[in-house]
């Protein structure tokens, strides 16, 4: 693959991004590689100078290693002798030029995207399971857990960002197309729009699942209004929109969708008993719980409106994943599958056995109650998880192991305090990706907001010991919730991904120590 200097200039001019250019007569004008990392350079590379941490020395390194053109928001002396494209916004420029370099792979994929404060990963996996059932496993995935760009084991790898940098995203999409993938299901975070990682990308289907305050802090969104604004961009950039009618800020979400999408291509869903007298548009799909237990989740989907009845997806569904909150995620995914051309039988078969590493993985122990490992990592997901457990187990003692990440998501900390006060009997506050912050200070900040008359707190920064002590103290009728990291096999500490066995492995080892060796946790 390659891109010419002239093509780059034309694209940047077309989008009113080019401020100036400097063309070197003696330098090649065809770029055969693209990169924003000075350590990843090949001969004739187009190099992007991006990010708050960019230093001019990185451009010098890139030039020495073979870069012949750079894109930046200001000229750099270190780029002397290189082609220079000076732009108004380098993140937008990188998205546009990367798409062109990788030959617009989105044009060869049916692209579906989910946004929401919670439920994105689960919904994405549900939809991938159904599409794979219909297309023979030709569904690519970009999620906060794993990225899948082909059918082979080596085509699946741990993701580093919920939504990758635009260059990586378009490269992965091109790889997926070359590997025979026909569909792409992806999570789109608010940061993806704030940082222009998906700039210029239009989705065949866009889902808005829910919203509540999250990712608000110095290094993320300055306030909730900015967070909501970034989330809304998915609606503006989708050909068909699917919205949870129960979410707060529904009017703003629906209005954003109608700016670019005909109301006939906007679909709403909600629980069977949900009523909103202020809702001015009909709800297209309803779902109702059939049966909840600690083995399966069963619910029924109803096609309510005339346009909904055109999709042959009405009927009963069973999920291997537990939690009544997953009925909403499942409903969204089934609607997406219906819009992609699937029928009820294909959907029911494809969604039934979907599991996700680190999501609602459970183990009923002999003497220490029910142990649950889940990725719940904000107030909304914590409240949903603990509420479900309280109802399912008839008001059990709830013991929670949780921590908050450092350097981001500062707004989550009071949310943890509120949710633990509301539902937990005992909390072990521990370490969870502290970054450059002091994990003890983070734990103390959460602890300061907890009502200790309702929830007893222990601060134990050794996460493995916190998990051990939580399970060891649990009685046979108690519930232990290990929240936040799921299947993550590292802790982010001072800029380093420090190896960590994962909550699942730690919990398995603790149960083995307490009760004897056996295979644990339903997959």
How would you label these PLM feature ranges?
Residues 78-79, 205-371, 447-451, 456:
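Acidic, Mg2+-coordinating active-site environments of NTP-dependent enzymes
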Residues 41-42, 62, 74-82, 150-152, ...:
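Short loop/helix-cap segments at secondary-structure boundaries that form the rim of catalytic
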Residues 68-78, 143-146, 246-248, 270-274, ...:
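Short, polar loop motifs at secondary-structure junctions
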Residues 45, 62, 97, 114, ...:
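Residue-level signal for inorganic ion chemistry
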Residues 1-96, 100, 318, 322, ...:
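N-terminal leader/targeting and accessory segments in enzymes
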């Amino acid at each position: 693959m390659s891109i010419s200097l002239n093509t780059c200039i034309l694209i940047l001019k077309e989008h009113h991004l080019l401020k100036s250019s400097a063309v070197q007569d003696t330098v090649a004008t065809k770029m055969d590689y693209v990169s924003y990392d000075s350590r990843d350079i090949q001969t004739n590379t187009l190099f992007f100078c991006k990010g708050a941490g960019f230093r001019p020395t990185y451009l010098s390194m890139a030039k020495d290693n073979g870069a012949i053109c750079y894109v930046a928001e200001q000229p750099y002396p270190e780029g002397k002798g290189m082609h220079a494209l000076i732009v108004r916004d380098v993140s937008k420029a990188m998205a546009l030029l990367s798409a062109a370099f990788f030959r617009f792979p989105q044009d060869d994929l049916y692209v579906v995207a989910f946004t929401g404060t919670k439920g994105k990963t689960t919904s994405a996996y549900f939809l991938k399971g159904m599409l794979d059932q219909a297309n023979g496993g030709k569904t690519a995935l970009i999620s906060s857990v794993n990225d899948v760009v082909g059918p082979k084991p080596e085509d699946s790898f741990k993701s580093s960002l919920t939504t990758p940098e635009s260059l990586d995203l378009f490269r992965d999409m091109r790889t997926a197309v070359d590997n025979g993938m026909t569909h792409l299901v992806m999570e789109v975070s608010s940061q993806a729009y704030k940082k222009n990682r998906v700039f210029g990308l239009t989705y065949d289907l866009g889902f808005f699942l829910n919203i509540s305050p999250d990712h608000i802090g110095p290094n993320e969104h300055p306030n909730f209004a900015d967070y909501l604004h970034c989330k809304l961009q998915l609606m503006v950039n989708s050909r068909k929109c699917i919205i949870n009618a129960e979410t707060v800020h529904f009017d703003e979400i629906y209005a954003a969708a109608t700016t670019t999408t005909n109301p006939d291509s906007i679909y709403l869903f909600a629980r069977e008993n949900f009523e909103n007298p202020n809702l001015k548009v009909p709800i297209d799909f309803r779902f109702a719980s059939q049966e909840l237990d600690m083995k399966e989740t069963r619910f029924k989907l109803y096609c309510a409106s005339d346009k909904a009845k055109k999709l042959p997806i009405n009927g009963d569904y069973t999920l291997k994943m537990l939690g009544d909150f997953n009925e909403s995620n499942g409903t969204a995914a089934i609607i997406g599958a219906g819009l992609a051309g699937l029928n009820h039988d294909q959907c029911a078969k494809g969604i039934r056995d979907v599991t996700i590493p680190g999501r609602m993985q459970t183990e009923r122990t002999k003497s220490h109650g029910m142990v649950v490992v889940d990725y719940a990592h904000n107030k909304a997901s914590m409240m949903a998880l603990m509420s479900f457990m309280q109802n399912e187990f008839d008001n059990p003692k709830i013991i929670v192991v949780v921590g908050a990440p450092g350097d981001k998501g500062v707004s989550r900390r009071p949310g943890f305090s509120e949710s633990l006060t509301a539902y937990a009997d005992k909390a072990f506050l521990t370490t969870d990706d502290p970054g450059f912050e002091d994990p003890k200070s983070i734990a103390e900040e959460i602890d300061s907001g907890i009502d200790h008359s309702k929830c007893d707190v222990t601060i134990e920064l050794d996460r493995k010991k916190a998990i051990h002590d939580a399970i060891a103290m649990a009685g046979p009728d108690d519930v232990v919730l290990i929240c936040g990291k799921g299947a993550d096999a590292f802790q982010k500490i001072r800029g380093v991904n420090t190896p960590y066995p994962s909550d699942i492995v730690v919990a398995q080892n603790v149960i083995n120590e307490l009760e004897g060796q056996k295979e644990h946790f339903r997959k």
